[in-house]
């Protein structure tokens, strides 16, 4: 294998194989857009396979799904940080969605803990959601206000689910996933990772 090939990411090499460049010879920009989109899909598929494959093998599938869905439910409207490198993203995902469920799976929580935790989460959604990134600035004040409202409503809905669910350990896992999302929108996290906060200000 040549040094050049070794340095090209697997997702990019797979995208090159799946897309015939000859078909796009008259539209280089279109080719690059399609290739980039396919790379993103391949990266996410591979990351999903790694995370859920390990969760399945270790008997943590339900716990992983619970933490992941709670995280995604809030992230849908509150956005937040993304890892800048695929390897970092995969390692963070394994920590959040496999290691954390393993650690917290047998820790029960009662509804008082749920109320206290989600009050903290709701406050963070009010103060910091939505949080953008350098590659995805959230432009438009009205747009951001709508996202904030939806993020807060989503938090209240998830609070209700956590309160009503009869399994004490499941309550804990829902809170863990939700707190991961709080970390991703908190300005302190941006500062610690030396990432730019309020990226929309550059365009408004």
Swiss-Prot record:
Topology term for the membrane: Multi-pass membrane protein
GO CC terms in record: plasma membrane
EC identifiers of the protein: 3.4.-.-
Compartments reported by the entry: Cell membrane
GO terms under biological process: proteolysis; quorum sensing
Keywords: Cell membrane, Hydrolase, Membrane, Protease, Quorum sensing, Transmembrane, Transmembrane helix
Pfam family membership, one: AgrB
Enzyme type, top EC level: hydrolase
Broad class of the protein's primary localization: membrane
Family: Belongs to the AgrB family.
Function: May be involved in the proteolytic processing of a quorum sensing system signal molecule precursor.
Protein name: Putative AgrB-like protein
């Amino acid at each position: 294998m040549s040094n050049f090939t070794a340095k090209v990411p697997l997702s990019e090499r797979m995208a090159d194989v799946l897309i015939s460049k000859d078909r796009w010879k008259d539209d280089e920009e279109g080719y690059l857009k399609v290739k980039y989109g396919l790379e993103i899909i391949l990266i996410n598929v591979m990351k999903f396979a790694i995370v859920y494959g390990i969760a399945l093998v270790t008997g943590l599938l339900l716990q992983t799904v619970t933490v992941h869905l709670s995280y995604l439910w809030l992230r849908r409207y509150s956005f937040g940080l993304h890892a800048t490198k695929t390897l970092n993203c995969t390692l963070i995902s394994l920590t959040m969605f496999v290691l954390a469920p393993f650690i917290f799976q047998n820790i029960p929580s009662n509804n008082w803990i749920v109320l206290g935790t989600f009050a903290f989460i709701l406050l963070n959604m009010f103060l910091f959601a939505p949080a953008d990134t350098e590659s995805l600035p959230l432009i438009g004040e009205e747009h951001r206000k709508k996202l904030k409202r939806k993020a807060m409503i989503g938090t209240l809905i998830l609070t209700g689910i956590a309160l009503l669910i009869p399994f004490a350990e499941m309550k804990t896992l829902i809170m863990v996933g939700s707190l991961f999302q709080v970390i991703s929108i908190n300005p302190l996290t941006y500062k610690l990772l030396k990432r730019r906060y309020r990226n929309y200000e550059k365009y408004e």
